[in-house]
Curated annotation (Swiss-Prot):
Subunit relationships: Monomer.
GO annotation (BP), single: protoporphyrinogen IX biosynthetic process
GO molecular function terms listed in the Swiss-Prot or TrEMBL record: hydroxymethylbilane synthase activity
Protein name: Porphobilinogen deaminase
């Protein structure tokens, strides 16, 4: 009998390949003898680097080509950073599993400064994230925020070339690429509330593909899934994506989930924050409740203004 096999669609960047290889190794650990093939693909989001993501369609651009590959039968599943997965998946796809979460924090990376507060007046900070921009501007309105796109190595090279005084990246990505030594400091959630799902990996497959779902179910990390259900519940209520400055971070304390969320103006002139606690079994509903609270306190007005700016 032929050995069982799986094909994993992945972006071509070094970080994306690491993530796919990590999931492949975990699958082979769970299923000895399983043959796993990586199917690298180029995405529009990787190719268009001279414009902000929000202007060219958001982070769904990192997924569409991988999803098309699954529909064509070229791959059985795709591995994504959870923060890149929209709150609503396209019809015909399921989120089959969510991996154990790595460090969800943002990393402050600089060759000359150890902390955001140490940056001099007018310093140039590179980031591709409206969420990060909003929170930095709220804390340090004197800084110059500039768009920074490209893979991790490209962003670090621009920092080293002196284009920026500091850049902000996901700590988990630097850790995974063994670049922890480049991190000058890890921003607390109070300094920079993480993106919804940041630090976890999501496994997407075709809806109703029971074979694949059964093979990957052992990768699902229940505690992480509960936390991310809360965060994505809030995001769903806000109809959020990378096109708007939204942060969401949930923590588990026994059977209780504690969710913090924020919505802010791009320039940091207004940031609405909220939090909620409740039973972990109701995580997604709690997220929706927090989303409603943020909307009632003005998030709807901010989100409308952000949409008009794009």
């Amino acid at each position: 009998m032929a050995a069982e096999s799986l094909r994993i669609a992945t972006r071509r960047s070094q970080l994306a390949m690491w993530q796919a290889e990590h999931i492949a190794a975990e699958l082979q650990r769970l299923h000895p003898g399983l043959e796993v093939e990586l199917v690298p693909m180029s995405t529009r989001g990787d190719e268009i680097l001279d414009q902000p993501l929000a202007r060219i369609g958001g982070k769904g651009l990192f997924m569409k080509e991988l999803e098309d590959g699954m529909l064509r039968g070229e791959a059985d599943l795709a591995v994504h950073s959870m923060k890149d997965i929209p709150w609503r998946l396209p019809e015909g796809f399921d989120l089959a599993a969510v991996s154990d979460r790595a460090d969800p924090r943002d990393a402050f990376v600089s060759n000359h400064y150890s902390d955001l507060d140490e940056l001099p007046h007018g310093a140039r900070v590179g980031t591709a994230s409206l969420r990060r921009q909003c929170q930095i501007m709220d804390r340090r309105p004197d800084l110059q925020i500039e768009v920074l796109r490209g893979n991790v190595q490209t962003r670090l090279r621009k920092l080293d070339d002196g284009v920026y005084d500091a850049i902000i990246l996901a700590a988990s990505g630097l850790d995974r690429l063994e670049l922890t030594h480049r991190i000058a400091g890890r921003l607390t959630p109070e300094q920079s509330l993480p993106a919804v799902g940041q630090g976890a990996l999501g496994i997407e497959c075709r809806e109703g593909d029971e074979r694949v779902m059964k093979l990957v179910e052992g990768l699902n990390h229940e505690a992480t899934r509960i936390r991310i259900n809360a965060e994505r519940g809030m995001n769903a209520r806000l109809e959020g994506s990378c096109q708007v400055p939204i942060g969401g971070y949930a923590e588990l304390d026994g059977d209780e989930v504690h969710l913090r969320g924020l919505v802010g103006a791009i320039d940091g002139s207004e940031v609405i924050r909220g939090e909620i606690r409740g039973p972990a079994a109701e995580a997604e509903n709690l997220g929706r409740q927090l989303g409603d609270d943020l909307l009632a306190r003005g998030a709807d007005r901010i989100l409308k203004a952000v949409a008009e700016q794009q």
